[in-house]
Amino acid sequence: MGRLMIAVLLCVMISQGFCSGVFELKLQEFLNKKGVTGNANCCKGSAAEGHQCECKTFFRICLKHYQANVSPDPPCTYGGAVTPVLGSNSFQVPESFPDSSFTNPIPFAFGFTWPGTFSLIIEALHTDSTDDLSTENPDRLISRMTTQRHLTVGEEWSQDLQVGGRTELKYSYRFVCDEHYYGEGCSVFCRPRDDTFGHFTCGERGEIICNSGWKGQYCTEPICLPGCDEDHGFCDKPGECKCRVGFSGKYCDDCIRYPGCLHGTCQQPWQCNCQEGWGGLFCNQDLNYCTHHKPCQNGATCTNTGQGSYTCSCRPGFTGDSCEIEVNECSGSPCRNGGSCTDLENTYSCTCPPGFYGRNCELSAMTCADGPCFNGGHCADNPEGGYFCQCPMGYAGFNCEKKIDHCSSNPCSNDAQCLDLVDSYLCQCPEGFTGTHCEDNIDECATYPCQNGGTCQDGLSDYTCTCPPGYTGKNCTSAVNKCLHNPCHNGATCHEMDNRYVCACIPGYGGRNCQFLLPENPQGQAIVEGADKRYSYEEDDGGFPWTAVCAGIILVLLVLIGGSVFVIYIRLKLQQRSQQIDSHSEIETMNNLTNNRSREKDLSVSIIGATQVKNINKKVDFQSDGDKNGFKSRYSLVDYNLVHELKQEDLGKEDSERSEATKCEPLDSDSEEKHRNHLKSDSSERKRTESLCKDTKYQSVFVLSEEKDECIIATEV
């Protein structure tokens, strides 16, 4: 019943455009002679002598599904309505009303199959104001009338009269199908159409009736011209016959011969089968006399025996060179005893006089005394001679010798066995069929064998149930064991309950199937997961272990962030160390060069950046400029213009001085060693560079780096 109510409520919510029928309630007459409510109070005014109670009556209608005990409470599963004030104490309900929102009869549209039963509640209520039509106040109730009925679909109105303690209500009702809906429950939809998708009208029960010239399930197949070849012809509209390629004719039953074929025929398109007496590719060559002149008559066969000669093979009953003479089989008078002979083609027939019979009337006739009638036939003498037999039912023939076989026309359908009776026949139907000729398939689904919401599919002498989830068996009566396939993991125990399963997890696991490893749980706590939520025998933990998952994600993020910070720190340290090494190496190189040259010349220059250089194309007094600049650095300034004057023998002196300088100021030993090896191994490169610098008219200045010697042009800033 609960499922029925849910289905009904859903159907009531469907748009009115999808209705299949309408329940109509027509209010006709209401009597409330005293003008009182249900609690015997006067609606309005005073019940004192000489005064009349006056009510303003309106109605509340509630249409429900069939209930053994009708309840007036909501919901009104089939629909509800509240009328405006229709009258006073006693009145007849008009069919029209100024308020266009109310019509009489009152319609209740259905969007589903009419079940055939209903429950109806009609409440008459009083109001002080026509604008106040609330129905919650029980003091307004004048009367309540309830009924439940069976109702078939039809145009005829059913009358009813409800009599209460002080009131009477006369009304009528019916259920009619919407347009294009048919059947007992208005569940058959059929809309006539005459377009590409069908050409049909609808019968009284909603069956499709094809228009003239159309056939098929939905009348979409045109009926071609009668006689149109089914294989070689077709049609797009009724009454026509279009030929397929290779065929022609009114009925498309003539094949098209090979182009140019003159005296030939075809069995298939594009053939040229020569007629007798003709040959060649196009059957245009005359081969014999028989073909030219056709001398043989009366259907005889002509055979060429040479040029200008032939032989005719005559059909029975004919003779002569050209079979032109018909043979008379009666010429020998074969009929005896006065029988009359009739010449036929290659035979004859004798018409015997009374009292004789046989092919040549050679046999004398029998009488009833000879008992000529068989199978219980009644013999009667013929006044003109001879006899005749009156055959019983089921027999025929001159002597009732033939038994009439009523099964000879194969009247039984669907491989049923036909039994020939005396004057009729009987069809023994195979399983699954019924009817006089076994033409009707028995609907095994008519008894609704499928249980628990299963869908029934009718077959031949059988049916098939498509079960909903959770049920199995021939009739869907067996519930499926949810624990059959061991859905629970990690040693959990499966319990079946309420058409579902519940997993009792061992400590440390969770999830519907105990598939998740959880953070450590309190001692002895077992977790159970069901179809709807996860349970714990001691405390509900809220379902999926989000805390554990979130904690794991946060931990991973912290590790990644810490690792990134550590990598960045290491890279910065390595970069600072590399810069310090490069700086120490450059300073050491400049100091070494300064020490070597300061012993010969006491000169100093300012070291300037490449971006600050200004070329003035003249020689510069580095000694005076150095004094002017007045740099007081821990490193002696170098006159790079004098570097090219260094001799090869000065290199050894430079090495010894560098070792002494190292004692005073520690440098990176690796950078020092690289520079010493570079000076010793690249002497040839240095000589080439010195030569290049000598030729530079701007008195170029260069520094010997770790990688290679370069010329740097120094100019005044």
UniProtKB/Swiss-Prot annotation:
| Post-translational modifications reported in the UniProt record | Ubiquitinated by mib, leading to its endocytosis and subsequent degradation.
All residue ranges annotated as the DSL domain in the record: 175-219
Segments passing through the bilayer: 548-568
Which stretches does the entry tag as region Disordered? 649-693
Record's keyword annotation contains Membrane: yes
Its membrane topology, per UniProt? Answer: Single-pass type I membrane protein
Q: Give any single GO term for biological process.
A: lateral inhibition
Q: Which InterPro entries match?
A: DSL, EGF-like_Ca-bd_dom, EGF-like_CS, EGF-like_dom, EGF-type_Asp/Asn_hydroxyl_site, EGF_Ca-bd_CS, Growth_fac_rcpt_cys_sf, Notch_ligand_N
* PROSITE patterns (alphabetical): ASX_HYDROXYL (PS00010), DSL (PS51051), EGF_1 (PS00022), EGF_2 (PS01186), EGF_3 (PS50026), EGF_CA (PS01187)
A GO CC term attached to the entry: membrane
Q: List the disulfide bonds.
A: 177-186, 190-202, 210-219, 224-235, 228-241, 243-252, 261-266, 274-283, 290-302, 296-312, 314-323, 330-341, 335-350, 352-361, 368-379, 373-389, 391-400, 407-418, 412-427, 429-438, 445-456, 450-465, 467-476, 483-494, 488-503, 505-514
Q: How does it assemble?
A: Interacts with mib.
What function does this protein fulfil? Acts as a ligand for Notch receptors and is involved in primary neurogenesis and somitogenesis. Can activate Notch receptors, thereby playing a key role in lateral inhibition, a process that prevents the immediate neighbors of each nascent neural cell from simultaneously embarking on neural differentiation. Required in somite segmentation to keep the oscillations of neighboring presomitic mesoderm cells synchronized.
The name under which this protein is listed is Delta-like protein D
**What organism is listed for this UniProt entry?**
Danio rerio
State the gene name recorded for this protein: dld
